[in-house]
């Protein structure tokens, strides 16, 4: 069984994760344009949940397409 996760960069599509990567993650942080563009959002697959840096928000999940882009409706 291989998991489907959404991946950035755009266009954001659900892609099959490589064997051994059984988590989808969403990582968000602010860059220099945060006030005008909002947070930078990175989506992808992982074998283990990425460690969170102090300025990041990281969430992980383990079901197909469970990491849609926060600003997009799951399609």
From Swiss-Prot:
KW Glycosyltransferase (keyword) present: no
Do you know which PROSITE patterns this protein is assigned to? SNAKE_TOXIN
Q: Which GO terms describe its molecular function?
A: acetylcholine receptor inhibitor activity; ion channel regulator activity; toxin activity
Tissue specificity note: Expressed by the venom gland.
Positions of disulphide bridges? 5-24, 17-45, 30-34, 49-60, 61-66
| UniProt subcellular location | Secreted
Per UniProt, the keywords (alphabetical) are: Acetylcholine receptor inhibiting toxin, Disulfide bond, Ion channel impairing toxin, Neurotoxin, Postsynaptic neurotoxin, Secreted, Signal, Toxin
Matching InterPro entries, A to Z?
Snake_3FTx (IPR003571), Snake_toxin-like_sf (IPR045860), Snake_toxin_con_site (IPR018354), Toxin_cobra-type (IPR054131)
Keyword Ribosomal protein tagged:
no
Read off the SUPFAM superfamilies from this record: Snake toxin-like (SSF57302)
Name of one Pfam family that matches: Toxin_cobra-type
What highest taxon heads this organism's lineage? Answer: Eukaryota
Signal peptide position in this chain?
Answer: 1-2
A single GO CC term, please?
extracellular region
The entry describes its oligomerization and partners as: Monomer in solution, homodimer in crystal state.
- What family classification does the UniProt entry report for this protein? Belongs to the three-finger toxin family. Long-chain subfamily. Type II alpha-neurotoxin sub-subfamily.
Briefly, what is this protein's role?
A: Binds to muscular and neuronal nicotinic acetylcholine receptor (nAChR) and inhibits acetylcholine from binding to the receptor, thereby impairing neuromuscular and neuronal transmission. Reversibly blocks chick and mouse muscle nicotinic acetylcholine receptors. Blocks muscle type nAChR with an IC(50)=30 nM, when heterologously expressed in oocytes. Also binds with high affinity to alpha-7/CHRNA7 nAChRs. In addition, shows a weak inhibition of neuronal alpha-3-beta-2/CHRNA3-CHRNB2 nAChR (IC(50)=2.9 uM).
Q: What is this protein called?
A: Alpha-elapitoxin-Bc2a
């Amino acid at each position: 069984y291989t998991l489907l996760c959404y991946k950035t960069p755009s266009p954001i599509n659900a892609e099959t994760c490589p064997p051994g990567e059984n988590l989808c993650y969403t990582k968000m942080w602010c860059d220099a344009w945060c006030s005008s563009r909002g947070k930078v959002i990175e989506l992808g697959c992982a074998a283990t949940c990425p460690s969170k840096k102090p300025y990041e928000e990281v969430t992980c999940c383990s079901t197909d397409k469970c990491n849609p882009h926060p600003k997009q409706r799951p399609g």
